[in-house]
């Protein structure tokens, strides 16, 4: 029971952080979170499905806290947005995108794999 309450509070805090200045989206997120927990209220706490649901909701909280950043367009004439970054926002360096791993060009027996353009 306490794990469920902890997960519920965790995801609500993450939603509050991610959607801080967007009252409509924050309200929709809170309603969706509440509905999800209400649907799971009747489950047996010892059921394996409860553990899966708790892992899922903690994952959602992590993504909301670290990956979701909202932007606001201040001037309609410009394509510039003010991003609402916070201390938990994950900043990547894109190094893995700049140098992707080499793609295999041969099949299992050393034969060239046919491509759709060949």
Curated annotation (Swiss-Prot):
Subunit structure: Interacts with RIP1.
Chief site of localization: mitochondrion
UniProt KW keywords: Chaperone, Mitochondrion, Transit peptide
Region Disordered, residue ranges: 70-118
Biased amino acid composition, Basic residues: 106-118
Family: Belongs to the complex I LYR family. MZM1 subfamily.
Lineage of source species: Eukaryota, Fungi, Dikarya, Ascomycota, Saccharomycotina
Purpose: Assembly factor required for Rieske Fe-S protein RIP1 incorporation into the cytochrome b-c1 (CIII) complex. Functions as a chaperone, binding to this subunit within the mitochondrial matrix and stabilizing it prior to its translocation and insertion into the late CIII dimeric intermediate within the mitochondrial inner membrane. Modulates the mitochondrial matrix zinc pool.
Species in which this protein is naturally found: Yarrowia lipolytica (strain CLIB 122 / E 150)
Composition-biased stretches (Basic and acidic residues): 74-90
GO biological process, one term: mitochondrial respiratory chain complex III assembly
GO cellular component: mitochondrial matrix
Gene Ontology terms for molecular function: protein folding chaperone
Keyword field contains Transferase: no
Subcellular location: Mitochondrion matrix
The encoding gene: MZM1
PANTHER family linked to this entry: COMPLEX III ASSEMBLY FACTOR LYRM7
Name of the featured protein: Mitochondrial zinc maintenance protein 1, mitochondrial
């Amino acid at each position: 029971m306490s794990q469920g309450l902890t997960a519920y509070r965790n995801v609500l805090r993450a939603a509050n952080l991610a959607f801080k200045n967007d009252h409509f989206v924050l309200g929709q997120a809170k309603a969706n979170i509440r509905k999800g927990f209400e649907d799971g209220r009747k489950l047996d706490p010892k059921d394996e499905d409860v553990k899966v649901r708790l892992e899922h909701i903690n994952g959602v909280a992590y993504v909301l806290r670290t990956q979701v950043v909202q932007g606001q367009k201040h001037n309609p004439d410009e394509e510039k947005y003010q991003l609402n970054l916070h201390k938990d926002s994950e900043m990547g360096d894109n190094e893995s995108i700049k140098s992707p791993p080499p793609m295999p060009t041969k099949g299992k027996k050393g034969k060239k794999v046919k491509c759709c353009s060949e």
